[in-house]
Design a protein with these regions (language model features):
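Conserved acidic donor-binding segment of nucleotide-sugar-dependent glycosyltransferases
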Residues: 305-306, 310-318, 326-332
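Nucleotide-activated donor-binding/catalytic signature segment of Leloir-type glycosyltransferases, i.e.
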Residues: 229-256, 261
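Membrane-proximal helix-turn-helix segments that form the acceptor-binding/catalytic region
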Residues: 24, 78-85, 101, 105-109, ...
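A short, well-ordered alpha-helix in the C-terminal region of glycosyltransferases
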Residues: 326, 333-348
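Conserved donor-binding/catalytic core segment of Leloir-type glycosyltransferases
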Residues: 5-7, 153, 184-216, 220
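N-terminal strand-loop element at the rim of the active site
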Residues: 8-13, 25-72, 159-173, 225-226
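Donor nucleotide-sugar binding/catalytic pocket of nucleotide-sugar-dependent glycosyltransferases
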Residues: 123, 139-183, 243-244
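Short hydrophobic beta-strand element within catalytic cores of glycosyltransferases
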Residues: 261-264, 283-293
């Protein structure tokens, strides 16, 4: 049996949705799948099996968004290298740059094929004020990884604009879309805005909070992230907001289905945000919910083209408040937006359309025959 080892330096809710979908697809496709994860909160068992995925966790505490996290990265890389090499995989599936050194070294030791999965382009993702030379070195390191990998996976082919001239040997677009399983839950009694994702300053959370306080909407927030210390005091003390922390993926879907609108604001001044393809937007489409997003992003293009939500300028609180008021005062319009999103989801923005594509890419990588997969629509 062909063995695949995933490397990921995070372990939110035990295993994050995109990784779980990719690894689960390969496990159901007959691969022996392992995932080496970094449990930064020491909240999950060292070893676990989920949906056919054998999970191995490095349980080293590391605070989000601090220098202490960067200092612990070498220890994580060394653990990932040793564990991956011992598993003797046929394929090493590395996610993002903070697994690159370990993945490349383990691939050289074992002779494994190397897959590089770009969830986020590292140099463009960092919002901290780092020296330009450091950012450039990160970009150069990612370019080398992209060119040396046997296969590169991106959630949107337009992310190639971030490659800065790097040319992958093979590349495939695997969109960040959910499996079709909308929960059957009752709508919240009060008009509710739900945000599930990173607790970060570039996600417009304080603007959303102000808009909800002004309009009387309820704001439910779930997730974790680097800016919790700065943002949680505002969120947790507002009567308009309920902060849930990190919750299981099934509860994320339930909150999505119960809400009236799903928030997905991204500051387009952060280069990585312009190409964001967040799971939450496609979960909203699956659950027939309108999306509230910000201009200057790939997601804004998608929402406009489908007509499944409202686009506002990022940071414009007055425009955000007016947009939210419009949604609250027009439930019929919300329903029409949700229906258009659901129709687009069914047409190809769902994981069932990605499974054959992922299995086909792996089959081609390993030289095994694979049926051609139908091409789902591109984002935007």
């Amino acid at each position: 049996m062909t063995r695949v080892v995933f490397l990921r330096s995070k372990s939110p809710a035990g295993i994050e949705p995109r990784l779980a979908k990719e690894a689960g697809t390969l496990a159901r496709g007959g691969y022996d799948v392992h995932a080496i994860l970094w449990d930064r909160t020491r909240s999950y068992p060292t070893h676990e099996v989920r949906d056919g995925i054998r999970i191995h966790r490095y349980r080293l505490a590391a605070p989000e968004g601090t220098v202490g996290l960067a200092r612990r990265l070498p220890r994580w890389q060394w653990f990932a290298l040793r564990k991956a090499a011992r598993l003797r995989p046929d394929v090493i599936h590395a996610i993002d740059l903070d697994t690159a050194w370990a993945a490349r070294a383990a691939a050289r030791i074992t002779g494994a094929k190397l897959v590089y999965d770009v969830f986020d382009f590292y140099a463009d993702m960092i919002t901290a004020d780092v020296p330009p030379k450091v950012r450039e070195r990160l970009a150069s390191a990612e370019q080398r990884m992209i060119e040396r990998a046997d296969l590169v996976i991106v959630p949107d082919l337009r992310r190639q604009a971030q490659f800065r001239g790097a040319r992958p040997r093979r590349i495939v677009e695997i969109m960040n879309v959910p499996q079709d399983r909308p929960p059957r839950v009752r709508a919240a009694p009060d008009f509710t805005v739900f945000y599930g994702g990173m607790i970060a300053k570039d996600r417009g959370l304080l603007d959303l909070l102000a808009a909800c306080e002004s309009t009387g909407a309820k704001f439910i927030v779930a997730g974790h992230g680097p800016d919790e210390n700065a943002l949680l005091p505002h969120l947790e003390t507002s009567p308009a907001c309920m902060f849930l922390g990190t919750i299981p993926y099934e509860e994320v879907l339930s909150q999505t289905a119960a809400a009236h609108v799903i928030a997905a604001l991204y500051d387009p001044q952060v280069p990585n945000n312009r190409y964001a393809a967040p799971n939450k937007v496609f979960e909203a489409m699956m659950c027939s919910k309108p999306v509230l997003t910000s201009d200057g992003t790939t997601i804004a293009d998608l929402v406009r083209s489908i007509g499944c939500g409202v686009v506002v300028p990022y940071g414009d609180r007055w425009a955000l408040q007016r947009a939210l008021e419009g949604l609250m005062l027009s439930p019929d319009n919300c329903e029409r937006m949700g229906a258009r999103g659901r129709a687009a989801f069914e047409s190809g923005y769902r994981w069932e359309a990605m499974e054959a594509r992922l299995l086909g890419a792996y089959g081609s990588l390993l030289g095994s025959p694979a049926a051609a997969a139908p091409e789902p629509p591109s984002i935007g």
